Design a protein with these regions (language model features):
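Conserved active-site and cofactor/substrate-binding residues in soluble primary-metabolism enzymes
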Residues: 2, 6, 26, 45, ...
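Oxidoreductase and adenylate-handling cofactor-binding alpha/beta cores
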Residues: 152-165, 176-187, 217-231
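General beta-strand structural signal in soluble alpha/beta enzymes
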Residues: 31, 84-87, 115-117, 140-144, ...
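Rossmann-fold NAD(P)-binding glycine/threonine-rich loop
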Residues: 90-110, 116-157
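N-terminal glycine-/serine-/threonine-rich beta1-alpha1-beta2 phosphate-ribose binding loop
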Residues: 1-109
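Substrate-binding/catalytic subdomain of NAD(P)-dependent oxidoreductase enzymes
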Residues: 182-183, 191-234
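Conserved phosphate/anionic-ligand binding catalytic regions in large, soluble enzymes, centered on
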Residues: 36, 170-178, 211-215
Length: 234
């Protein structure tokens, strides 16, 4: 999707910076989408080629020589000899947060660190996934699931580690607030929703945001991560 493609672009642009500043020499050895996967454990995938394929509307399975149409993301995770999994599939709460949940479970069990902006697996299996990560000595990082542009989870979990946090106040979904502001300005519901979609604030039919699912998911993650309250969505 857009996030994975943008990640590849940034990784390509920042390669020298990451090496010089942090001593990180990252190689993308595999990638998957809804139509297949590509895997090259020896040489790694060419980031520009991956971005070009996805920008053209093609599948990663069309990657020259290394594309695999029969593979799902879970097949790639179960096979790849990788250090880190970046999991950025759709939330899919109506499907039990799959395939993201299975991919993350498999990666943790195989000793991979996991970084994900995907709320779905965390709101249905937060405790399980953290226990898996701890038992296998790896990290599960998910700062991008809540207030991706702000260090909200980082502050709550690490900066304020010595504090007792007893209450959270938040506006967890900016899209909803944006639509409400337009309604207050006199626009109809349909007009406000259409403008939000045109301006890129609202995606798809908007139900994930406007029916409160996004806000609920973020609050579940905050409750678990910051307040240590074992909340989950079903």
């Amino acid at each position: 999707g857009n996030l994975g493609r943008r990640f590849c672009t940034i990784l390509d642009e920042k390669r020298d910076h990451l090496r010089q500043r942090y001593g990180l020499d990252l190689t993308l050895i595999g990638a998957a989408d809804s139509r297949g996967a590509a895997y090259d454990p020896k040489n790694g995938l060419n980031l520009e080629e991956v971005v070009a394929l996805k920008s053209s509307g093609a599948s990663i399975a069309d990657y020259p020589d290394m594309g695999r149409e029969a593979w799902l993301a879970t097949d790639l995770v179960a096979t790849a000899q990788a250090d880190v999994l970046l999991e950025a599939s759709p939330v899919n709460l109506d499907q039990g947060a799959e395939p993201g949940l299975s991919s993350i479970r498999t990666a943790l069990r195989r000793g991979m660190h996991v970084v994900t902006p995907n709320k779905g697996p965390l709101v249905v299996a937060y405790s399980e996934l953290h226990e898996l990560a701890a038992s296998h000595g790896v990290q599960l990082r998910f700062d991008g699931t809540v207030a991706g542009g702000l260090p909200a989870l980082y502050i709550g979990q690490r900066t304020l580690r010595g504090a007792v946090i007893s209450q959270l106040e938040a506006v967890p979904n900016l899209c909803t607030g944006y639509v409400i502001d337009m309604l207050a300005d006199g626009l109809t519901w349909d007009q406000a929703r259409e403008r939000a979609r045109e301006e890129g604030v609202l995606e798809g039919d908007g139900s994930w945001d406007l029916e409160g699912w996004d806000a609920a998911a973020k609050l579940v993650i905050l409750a678990n991560a910051v307040l240590d309250v074992p909340a989950r969505m079903e």
